[in-house]
Regions:
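Hydrophobic beta-strand segments of well-ordered beta-sheets in folded domains
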Residues: 3-8, 43, 206-208, 242-249, ...
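Conserved mixed alpha/beta catalytic, RNA-binding, or beta-rich assembly cores of soluble enzyme
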Residues: 11-232, 236-238
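Short amphipathic alpha-helical segments
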Residues: 1-4, 25, 31-35, 263-271
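C-terminal structured domains
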Residues: 218-271
C-alpha cells in the first residue's frame, strides 16, 4: 500500500459489447454429439446486472479457443440475468474450466476493478482521457496479484456466478481496493497521473508489440484485455501488459504514438 501513499498522498501535498440472443449452436464448429457412450458435461457461467460486456467477452473467448471441440455453446439473457452454457465431452472439461477460470479472473481483476474505481473516484480536475489513463493504471498496478488471487478463489466451482463470487468470496480484495481508493486525492492533477504512470513504466518487465493498431504479448498472442475497461485500445493493452519495452510496426495512431513518446521515450521503438 506504500506505493499508493508515496505516489498519490505525497503528490497531493505538492499539488457494449453487444449482447447475443440465445443461440445454442449444434457445435461451435457445427459438430454434433454422435458418440452415444460419451458423458457430456455442462459448464455454466452466470451474471446478474451489468450491461453484458463481461459475459460477451467470456463468450467470445471460449468460442474462439475451443472451436475445434465437438461442443455446444450458448449465450442467453433473461431480464437482468445473463448465462453462458458450454457443453462438451467430460474429458475436455478440465481444460475448459481452467481456461474459463483464468479469463473470469481477468474479468474481475480488470473489468470489475475498473468499474469499482470509476464509481468510487470523482477526480474533477482530470479530463476524461486523463481519468481513463489513471483508472487503467490503477488496475494495472496490481493486476497480476489480483488475477492470481481471484483464480484461486474460483477453484472447485461447478457453476460460476460472477457477481456472487465478487460479493461473497472476494471481500478481502474489495477491502484492498477501498484502501487504495482512500489514497487517491480528490484534487488529483495531471502531473500526479504522469508520475504514477512513469512509476509503472519504470517497474515494467518484458516486451509488448503493436502492429497496425493491435497489441501482442511477448509470445505474439493478440491482446484484448483492455476491452474489459469499456474501450479496447493499444494504450490500454500497454498499461495492462506491464511491459518494459514496446515495439511498434506499421501504422501507429497519433494518440498511441504521443503516449509512448511521453511515458516510454527510448523504451518505445518505432520500426
Amino acid at each position: 500500500m506504500s506505493i499508493y501513499y508515496n505516489v498519490f498522498w505525497t503528490a497531493s501535498q505538492a499539488e457494449n459489447a453487444p449482447l447475443y440472443k440465445r443461440k445454442l449452436q449444434k457445435g461451435i464448429n457445427n459438430f454434433v454429439f454422435t458418440a452415444y457412450n460419451t458423458i457430456v458435461e455442462e459448464i455454466t457461467i452466470t451474471q446478474n446486472g451489468f450491461d453484458g460486456l463481461y459475459m460477451s467477452y467470456l463468450y467470445g473467448k471460449v468460442r474462439e479457443r475451443f472451436s475445434f471441440l465437438p461442443a455446444e455453446c450458448g449465450l442467453e439473457k433473461q431480464g437482468e440475468r445473463t448465462e453462458i452454457a458450454f457443453k462438451t465431452d467430460g474429458e475436455y472439461c478440465p481444460y475448459v474450466r481452467k481456461f474459463l477460470q483464468e479469463h473470469i479472473a481477468d474479468v474481475i481483476a480488470i473489468g470489475y476493478k475498473y468499474e469499482f474505481f470509476k464509481r468510487r473516484l470523482s477526480l474533477p480536475l482530470l479530463s476524461g482521457e486523463q481519468k481513463r489513463l489513471l483508472l487503467t493504471a490503477l488496475v494495472a498496478a496490481d493486476y497480476r496479484e489480483d488475477r492470481a488471487y481471484v483464480a484461486k478463489r474460483l477453484c472447485g466451482f461447478e457453476e460460476y456466478c460472477l457477481d456472487g463470487v465478487f460479493h461473497f468470496r472476494l471481500q478481502e480484495l474489495k477491502r484492498r481496493w477501498e484502501n487504495i481508493a482512500d489514497y487517491v486525492p480528490t484534487d488529483m492533477t495531471e502531473s500526479s497521473v504522469d508520475g504514477f504512470i512513469e512509476f509503472l513504466v519504470d517497474d515494467g518487465e518484458g516486451k509488448l508489440y503493436i502492429k497496425n493498431g493491435k497489441a501482442y504479448d511477448a509470445d505474439y498472442r493478440l491482446l484484448s484485455r483492455s476491452l474489459l475497461t469499456g474501450v479496447q485500445s493499444p494504450i490500454g493493452e500497454v498499461l495492462l501488459g506491464g511491459a518494459e519495452q514496446v515495439y511498434c510496426f506499421g501504422e501507429v495512431d497519433d494518440r498511441t504514438r504521443a503516449f509512448l513518446k511521453k511515458y516510454y521515450a527510448a523504451k518505445a521503438v518505432f520500426c
